[in-house]
Amino acid sequence: MMTAKAVDKIPVTLSGFMHQLPDSLYPVEDLAAPSVTIFPNGELGGPFDQMNGVAGDGMINIDMTGEKRPLDLPYPSSFAPISAPRNQTFTYMGKFSIDPQYPGASCYPEGIINIVSAGILQGVTPPASTTASSSVTSASPNPLATGPLGVCTMSQTQPELDHLYSPPPPPPPYSGCTGDLYQDPSAFLSPPPTTSTSSLAYQPPPSYPSPKPAMDPGLIPMIPDYPGFFPSPCQRDPHGAAGPDRKPFPCPLDSLRVPPPLTPLSTIRNFTLGGPSAGVTGPGASGGGEGPRLPGSGSAAVTATPYNPHHLPLRPILRPRKYPNRPSKTPVHERPYPCPAEGCDRRFSRSDELTRHIRIHTGHKPFQCRICMRNFSRSDHLTTHIRTHTGEKPFACDYCGRKFARSDERKRHTKIHLRQKERKSSAPSSSASAQSSASGPGGSQAGGSLCGNSAIGGPLASCTSRTRTP
């Protein structure tokens, strides 16, 4: 919108409307609300003859309180003047209004010109019989009754309207997009009026349908499909608990999940007193209740089923015994379980003892620590080892109260107290013997002196001698 108050004829160029305001404008107080009508290319006539129009020299008349003040609008050299032939017309569109001053309530204490929209449209040749007419939107005698602004509108011919409201070119089609997203805007514009002369009032902007809330998933694929990395939706867990497929661990986990098995019962039964095997030969096979022995394990050559728990061969003990020829306290007939390994002459009275011993040869360690994954051949060794992790010390010393995790450690510690006790007991006996040897000759001398003293004192000696004699 353009707002102006003028008292004199003001020459204004078109470029001046677009860029800057002339310095000759100044406000005039107490002016009535005017009405402005612009006829740049039309002819005067019709029911608005009483209004001011454009003169032949291109002047625009603005009606201000009944006075006629022409306004020069010289066109620049690049535009053809109005008197030029009408094979090519230039149409200027604009809206002018004058803001009256409100006492104490206006944001603009002085009237100024505000250019809201102005444009030069070119390229439409109207027919010779086409005329332009104008009408004022407010027909009330007092324009201020409807509002503070007086709006001047213009009416153009049918071809000009077609040029003004021609739809913009459609956007370029995008690959992968359907026609539902972008539709032709001309379908939403109302068709222009069919009459050659019409009055255009302010029309609201056309209403466009809202876009679809949900888009086709095939339009813009945000996440590409990688069948090599992610499984198909039908293979995924419906609850979302299962993640993408992972490669299997290269090392087998069975050794970590499943504990090593114990010695099978069939192996233990092979070394019981059930009798010699069918393949046992030799003179010593039936004597002394001997169990099955491997070839070369004794004086008699015996052929029997080798001991192979989990196909583990029997290996000789590399560390020799501390006392190889030490006689056992238990007689031989009470130790019916000999060791089947070559070069080992151990015998046991219980089968579980033989089983523990055979693990020394085979290297079988069925007991595993779940904390450090260390394996042991005996369960008691595993029990004492676990105490190193837990810090448990169930064995306490009877003398000092010190605690130990193993009973043999407490036993070694107790021997220290026993040796100290022996030393303490031997020290008083030696000191007592030394005192007795030193007090022997001294006691006789004291007795002699005492006797001498008593002899010296006659009546005391006779008294004592009298009392001692019956």
Curated annotation (Swiss-Prot):
Keyword Translocase on entry: no
Enzyme Commission number(s) from the entry: 2.3.2.-
Pathway involvement of the protein, from the record: Protein modification; protein sumoylation
Top-level taxon in the UniProt lineage: Eukaryota
First-level EC class: transferase
GO biological process: aorta development; brain segmentation; facial nerve structural organization; fat cell differentiation; gene expression; learning or memory; motor neuron axon guidance; myelination
Record field: compositional bias (Basic residues): 412-422
Gene Ontology CC annotation, any one: cytoplasm
GO molecular function: chromatin binding; DNA binding; DNA-binding transcription activator activity, RNA polymerase II-specific; DNA-binding transcription factor activity; DNA-binding transcription factor activity, RNA polymerase II-specific; HMG box domain binding; RNA polymerase II cis-regulatory region sequence-specific DNA binding; RNA polymerase II-specific DNA-binding transcription factor binding
Name recorded for this polypeptide: E3 SUMO-protein ligase EGR2
